[in-house]
From Swiss-Prot:
It comes from Ligilactobacillus salivarius (strain UCC118). This is D-alanine--D-alanine ligase. Its EC number is 6.3.2.4. Mg(2+) 2 binds at E314, N316. The gene is ddl. The lineage of its organism: Bacteria, Bacillati, Bacillota, Bacilli, Lactobacillales. The keyword Protein biosynthesis does not apply. Gene3D superfamilies: 3.40.50.20, ATP-grasp fold, A domain, ATP-grasp fold, B domain. GO terms for molecular function: ATP binding; D-alanine-D-alanine ligase activity; metal ion binding. One of its GO terms (cellular component) is cytosol. Residues 141-347 form the ATP-grasp domain.
Length: 378
């Protein structure tokens, strides 16, 4: 008897700065999925959050102009209906596994994971709470610190406490060179390296455009940027390590390096580091994955100082899958091919769904429970 193919739904796009990166990742994954094993549907969230159906999403996959397709599709949509944005969800009723390839807002912050949970379907990646915490740099650092995982010192600045953190005070505590980062943005959006009061104030003003929580971090001098990929649910493993080297004229691996002009960026995989340092970074990656309760996959980013001391930077719970993305490349050099990696991620999603199905949510029937007497005092 022939085995039934699994129906995989790729969700991509979204309203983040990585919309086009998401499209490229999803296209690569679609091409790599073994069509003898899987039936594949694709659903694109537009930049305004409207979910296109499979047919129209495939038109964009096949090269039609995205703006033209979206304009044509939404012209007759009644947006007074609060469910209009997700009206095409009816197409997913026979989906076996959701594969979100949405970076940043909506994709990595727990939003779309909540949708999958409501639909009671398996999905690749971390759960609702884990995704939300991992996307918030402030909550991530707090949780890692509680678990003894080394990360850079910082202060949290909000519109309410901004006056309590003038540049002079923060510089005295963390050093004159600082990084100013929105807590809940990806792709280095809104991140600034500052060295004086004027730059600091301008960076805060810009950062508040993207979030009301701003991290002001100490700057590690001339760090090496090292990456580690993690795979698994509870039984997890770390990949070999990779490194990013940017042009000497640039301050850090910023949005421009990532998406505008990456011609001067060098990716080294695997990177040759002292064995002790390599093992420490791999162990910190596994410890962080567990502390954040991640599932399926994550890429861990580190800064290594001149004394070979690694500092945890951040976690990416839905890393890119483009031709130059580090997550799949690190597994490639670790012995797992691109297509095999995708097969494993799909199985991990099914395993996690089945494990969660064993959890009981039984409640006493309302009206049958025994209650105490209510005493009204004077």
């Amino acid at each position: 008897m022939e085995n039934k193919k699994l129906h995989i739904a790729l969700l991509f796009g979204g309203n983040s700065s990585e919309h086009d990166v998401s499209k490229r990742s999803a296209h690569n994954i679609y091409d790599a999925l073994d069509k003898d094993k899987y039936d594949v549907s694709v659903f694109m969230f537009t930049k305004k959050g409207f979910l296109l159906g499979n047919k129209d999403s495939m038109r964009i996959f096949d090269g039609e102009n995205e703006d033209d397709v979206v304009t044509e599709v939404i012209k007759d949509v009644d947006f007074s209906n609060p469910l209009a944005n997700i009206q095409n969800l009816a197409e997913v009723k026979d989906v076996d596994v959701f594969y979100p390839v949405i970076h940043g807002n909506m994709g990595e912050d727990g939003t779309v994971q909540g949708l999958f949970r409501l639909l009671n379907k398996p999905w690749i990646g971390s759960g609702v709470a884990s995704s939300g915490v991992s996307f918030d740099k402030d909550l991530t650092k707090k949780l890692l610190t509680l678990n003894g995982i080394r990360n850079t010192k910082y202060v949290l600045v909000t519109p309410e406490n901004k006056a309590d953190y003038p540049y002079a005070k923060v510089a005295e505590e963390l050093g004159e060179t600082l990084f100013v980062k929105p807590a809940r943005q990806g792709s280095s959006v809104g991140i600034h390296k500052v060295r004086n009061e004027e730059e600091y104030n301008a960076a805060l003003e810009d950062g508040f455009k993207y979030d009301y929580k701003i991290l002001v971090e100490e700057a590690i001098k001339n760090p090496r940027e090292v990456e580690c990929s993690v795979l698994g649910n509870r039984d997890i493993k770390a990949s070999k390590l990779g490194a990013i080297r940017i042009p000497e004229s640039d301050d850090f691996y910023d949005y421009n390096n990532k998406f505008v002009d990456a011609s001067g960026v060098v990716f080294e995989m695997p990177i040759k580091l002292p064995e002790k340092l390599t093992k420490e970074i791999q162990q910190m990656s596994l410890d962080a994955f567990r502390a954040l309760d991640n599932r399926g996959l994550a890429r861990m980013d580190f800064l290594v100082d001149k004394n070979d001391v690694p500092y945890f930077g951040e976690v990416n719970t839905l890393p890119g899958f483009t031709n130059i993305s580090l997550y799949p490349q690190l597994w490639e050099v670790s012995g797992i091919s691109y297509s095999e990696l995708i097969d494993q991620l799909i199985q991990l999603a099914i395993d996690e769904f089945n494990d969660n199905a064993k959890i009981h949510y039984d409640f006493t029937k309302l009206g049958t429970e025994k209650v105490g007497k209510k005493i009204i005092g004077e």
